[in-house]
């Protein structure tokens, strides 16, 4: 059975056909607009194999989002520094992903816990077409250190299986997207477990899909490698989606090619 390669296919497409564009960071990119990737989560956990992805950072970042945090201190305490470039001297990032997921402000002064609401809706009305979580709070974007790149996601249940579709407005294909795929695949597994469902698909939809000009050498190396089978995710049982710990997430048979380092465009 051939190994699915939607990520590598998109990486190659943008590498070969992307339009040269300027960008906020001043680095320069080659870019294509609008693309979709689909992953059957029952067939394997989509942790990219053409380079090693730092799973510890993926897991701790997702747990940090689920905690509703706005400060990088908790990440740093667990050895994860992927948000440090955008944080203030005190570690603050403003009302970024986790804050919006867990504490979206309402006009009356209250807050909405979108994750709790999503779990409840999966349990009580799995066919709802309104099960959406958004980090794109227009009124609070000026206060954010970085506006959300992965902006909102929707859950869908069919035949007892949970699928998730993410819309990512800005997709750094080499550095960011492998993290995002793994993170939302993991979140889908967690949400499915909370609702007593199996897993279906993770659907990734990208807006500005780009490769930075200072990642060209690294992308060339990655595209020269043959993909390997995806690993298996084993997730511990937890009563609440907010109870998961790093030790609850076990990935078996991950056999990637070596990691490839590259600079982050800030």
Swiss-Prot record:
It is an enzyme of class 2 (transferase). The keyword Transmembrane helix does not apply. DUMP binds at residues 24, 129-130, 169-172, 180, 210-212. It comes from the Bacteria. One of its GO terms (molecular function) is thymidylate synthase activity. (6R)-5,10-methylene-5,6,7,8-tetrahydrofolate binds at residues 54, 172, 265. GO terms for biological process: dTMP biosynthetic process; dTTP biosynthetic process; methylation. InterPro entries: Thymidate_synth/dCMP_Mease, Thymidate_synth/dCMP_Mease_dom, Thymidate_synth/dCMP_Mease_sf, Thymidylate_synthase, Thymidylate_synthase_AS. It is found in: Cytoplasm. It catalyses: dUMP + (6R)-5,10-methylene-5,6,7,8-tetrahydrofolate = 7,8-dihydrofolate + dTMP. Its EC number is 2.1.1.45. Pathway: Pyrimidine metabolism; dTTP biosynthesis. Keywords: Cytoplasm, Methyltransferase, Nucleotide biosynthesis, Transferase. Gene3D superfamilies: Thymidylate synthase/dCMP hydroxymethylase domain (3.30.572.10). Belongs to the thymidylate synthase family. Bacterial-type ThyA subfamily. NCBIfam families: PRK01827.1-3 (NF002497), PRK01827.1-5 (NF002499), thym_sym (TIGR03284). Catalyzes the reductive methylation of 2'-deoxyuridine-5'-monophosphate (dUMP) to 2'-deoxythymidine-5'-monophosphate (dTMP) while utilizing 5,10-methylenetetrahydrofolate (mTHF) as the methyl donor and reductant in the reaction, yielding dihydrofolate (DHF) as a by-product. This enzymatic reaction provides an intracellular de novo source of dTMP, an essential precursor for DNA biosynthesis. This is Thymidylate synthase. It comes from Mycobacterium sp. (strain KMS).
């Amino acid at each position: 059975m051939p190994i699915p390669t939607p990520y590598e296919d998109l990486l190659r497409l943008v590498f070969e056909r992307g339009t040269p564009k300027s960008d906020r960071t001043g680095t320069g990119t080659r870019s294509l607009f609008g693309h979709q990737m689909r992953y059957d989560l029952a067939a394997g956990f989509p942790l990219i194999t053409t380079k090693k992805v730092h799973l510890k950072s993926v897991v701790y970042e997702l747990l940090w989002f689920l905690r509703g945090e706005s400060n990088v201190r908790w990440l740093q305490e667990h050895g994860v520094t992927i948000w440090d470039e955008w944080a203030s001297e005190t570690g603050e990032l403003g009302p970024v992903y986790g804050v919006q997921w867990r504490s979206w402000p309402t006009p009356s002064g209250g807050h909405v816990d979108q994750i709790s609401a999503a779990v409840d809706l999966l349990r009580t009305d799995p066919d709802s077409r309104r099960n959406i979580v958004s980090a794109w709070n227009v009124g609070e974007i000026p206060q954010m250190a970085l506006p959300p790149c992965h902006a909102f996601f929707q859950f869908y249940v069919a035949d007892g299986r949970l699928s998730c579709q993410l819309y990512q407005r800005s997709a750094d294909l080499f550095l960011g997207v492998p993290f995002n795929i793994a993170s939302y695949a993991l979140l889908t597994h967690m949400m499915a477990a909370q609702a007593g469902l199996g897993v279906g698909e993770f659907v990734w939809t990208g807006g500005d899909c780009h490769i930075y000009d200072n990642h060209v050498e690294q992308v060339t190396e990655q595209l020269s490698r043959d993909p390997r089978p995806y690993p298996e995710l084993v997730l511990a049982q937890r009563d609440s989606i907010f109870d998961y710990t790093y030790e609850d997430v076990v990935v078996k048979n991950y056999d990637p090619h070596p990691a490839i380092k590259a600079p982050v465009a800030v």
